[in-house]
Amino acid sequence: TFVPCETQVIKTFYSNNMNTLTTKQGIGTKVQLCTMMFMQYMLSAVWWVPLAAYLSHTLKLEVYQVSLVLSAMAIGAMASSFIGAIADRYFAAEKILAVLNILTGAFLLLAAQQTSFVPLMACVVLAMLCHMPTQSLTSTIAMSHTPSEQFPRIRMFGSVGWVASGIFSVIALHVMHLSAFDDTNLPMYCGAAVCFVAALLNLRLPHTPPSVDKSAGISVMDITGFSAFSLMKDKNYRVFMILTFLAIIPFNLYHVYGSMILADEHVQNITVTLNLGQLAEMFFLVITTSILIKSGIKNTLIFGMIALVVRYASFYIGAETGLQWFYYIGIIVHGLIFGLFFVGGQVYTDNVAPKEMKAQAQGLLFFL
């Protein structure tokens, strides 16, 4: 089995923690964590989802230039483990989150004003170096204040925020009567505004102090994030990380080029269309905990990987036949992929990682 006695372990863990949920996590704290997820993923979606279409159709960048700008996500993910190590040792996670959101907003404001490749590339890379670590930080903060098996239900509000980002497009097109939104720099300005609001709310989050004594210091292994690789001594976790590495390659291609493909197919309201996947994700995140309990981590991850195959088969068939509804199938199964494979993997990582390495372990997962 992928994890020895996995189903029984999860059932025991879930049962024990459900009994302490109300004592460990008050209603106020739960609202704060849900709001944190909502804002963090709204600010991601509002500018990143339509970026490829803006670069290719409005700025008329070369294909290789578009690819380089969009590689900023991978570059930014490299900072995740390092920021996680800092959070584990030196500063409260919610304070780091607030600072990173302010910096992300500032770089987005600069990026929105650029029209040539080099300065735009620089601004987007700097923005993603600040933004990508926030995804693992929000997971660490949430699972520090609620049982990890309940994390999918907190994380669901990130999906709500992602879907809600479409409201900017709706307001621009139907209330302000602008001729375009997704193909302009307006999403970057909207993303910056959400960043600043999120940073203010971050300062009200429950205190999440470092889990390691400052006197322990920080090594080169910690700075590079390599310390978290020690978790891969566990054969089960090693298999999981290899599968994650392989699965994330096509997954990122969907996020990076999805808006460009839909723009080429003349789909209207690209952000809203892609958000259908997040609507499905909201449903599957609600039931992810139950699936983990009944099926175990191994089967949950397998279900998610099967959904990956369905997605890309649908996109291939849609491209070959010209039938757009195949694209919608590929978009909707996003909920299965994200809820079962990626969020299930975050829960697994939190259970495997020792206390002093939880933030760094989540950072490593997001780096992959």
What are these regions (language model features)?
Residues 79-92, 173, 284-297:
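Helix-to-loop junctions at the C-terminal end of transmembrane segments
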Residues 95-109, 299-314:
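Structural signature of the two symmetry-related core transmembrane helices
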Residues 23-74, 236-273:
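Helix-loop boundary and gating motifs at the non-cytosolic
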Residues 125-157:
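Cytoplasmic helix-loop-helix junction between adjacent transmembrane helices
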Residues 192-212:
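C-terminal membrane-cytosol helix-exit motif in multi-pass small-molecule transporters
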Residues 18-27, 205-241:
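Juxtamembrane intracellular "pre-TM" segments in multi-pass secondary transporters
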Residues 68-85, 275-287:
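Central cavity-lining transmembrane alpha-helices of secondary-active solute carriers
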Residues 38, 107, 117-134, 245, ...:
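Hydrophobic core of transmembrane alpha-helices in multi-pass small-molecule transporters
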